[in-house]
């Protein structure tokens, strides 16, 4: 797919950032078409633990807007044609040249809030692109003059490293916890009762989720509030996952389903939260497909 993009956009500035194997910590960037086309390989951080480069972020700059796309798909044809995925997209960010009054001095409370969201989104995006080893000139050309007016989302990134103290709240689910805590504080100021709905989660790799880790994720999804006492974990976490039979009967078959990772030893362990698993089922029109989506929802209707 990379070659196809380069071939169809010979005059565009195109940058791909992809991972390297852990045993190959560094590699020279690939540059072509007089510097317009680049493939970059960000190095692994020099810290303990296991790390990988795993974001799926697409930024497309038009003359008058920027399109931001976050998907669960890798840049591989089979990911877009043979797996069930999810895509979030924000389009038509207005160019600053068309909206100078957004940064005018006269503003009310709502406009101040808009500006804060604009600045935060822009800052987080630039910070993340730099952490992905994207050159500053590419970042500047991509975001020059773009005004994120009307953005209604907060950007949460995960950057592998070892963080301590306040830095722990800058990334991953602890940043999510910080954001949602401020929302809970707002609700409390408006006398809106606090709720603790269960989490519905769909993912391709389960790993080895301990009860402590799941409680930590639960707390983050609810702004840091502790799990209600005497509430069973399986009443609060629902992990949707395909069965072995579902994988065998899928369109791609078990041999091609390597993205679905749940080891039998992990499942057999006493500590594994088996009751939290819910059977994945296809809907009409998507028979035989397997999920690669990453989705999480807090909902009373689970």
Named regions from a protein language model:
Residues 1-302:
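PLD/PLD-like phosphodiesterase catalytic module centered on the HKD motif
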């Amino acid at each position: 797919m990379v070659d196809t993009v380069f071939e169809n956009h010979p005059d565009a500035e195109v940058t791909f950032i992809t991972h390297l194997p852990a045993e190959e910590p560094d590699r020279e960037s690939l540059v072509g078409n007089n510097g317009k086309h680049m493939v970059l390989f960000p190095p692994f951080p020099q810290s303990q633990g296991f790390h990988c480069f795993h974001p799926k972020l697409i930024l497309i700059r038009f003359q008058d807007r920027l399109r931001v796309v976050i998907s669960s798909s890798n840049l591989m044809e089979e990911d877009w044609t043979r797996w069930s995925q999810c895509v979030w997209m924000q389009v038509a960010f207005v160019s600053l040249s068309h909206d100078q009054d957004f940064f005018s001095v006269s503003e009310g409370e709502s406009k101040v809030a808009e500006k804060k969201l604009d600045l935060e989104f822009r800052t987080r995006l630039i910070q993340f692109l730099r952490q992905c080893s994207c050159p500053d000139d590419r970042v500047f050309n991509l975001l020059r003059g773009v005004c994120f007016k009307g953005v209604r989302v907060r950007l949460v990134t995960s950057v592998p490293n070892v963080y301590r103290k306040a830095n722990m709240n800058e990334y991953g689910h602890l940043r999510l916890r910080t954001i949602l805590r401020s929302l809970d504080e707002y609700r409390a100021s408006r006398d809106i009762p606090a709720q603790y709905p269960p989490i519905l989660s769909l993912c391709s790799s389960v790993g080895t989720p301990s009860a402590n880790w799941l409680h930590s994720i639960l707390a983050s999804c609810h702004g840091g509030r502790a799990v209600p006492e005497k509430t069973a974990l399986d009443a609060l976490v629902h992990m949707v996952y395909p069965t072995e039979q579902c994988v065998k009967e899928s369109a791609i078959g078990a041999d091609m389903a390597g993205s679905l990772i749940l080891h039998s030893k992990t499942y057999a362990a006493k500590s594994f939260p088996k009751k939290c698993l819910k059977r994945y089922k296809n809907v009409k029109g998507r028979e035989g497909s397997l999920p690669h989506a990453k989705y999480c929802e807090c909902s009373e209707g689970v």
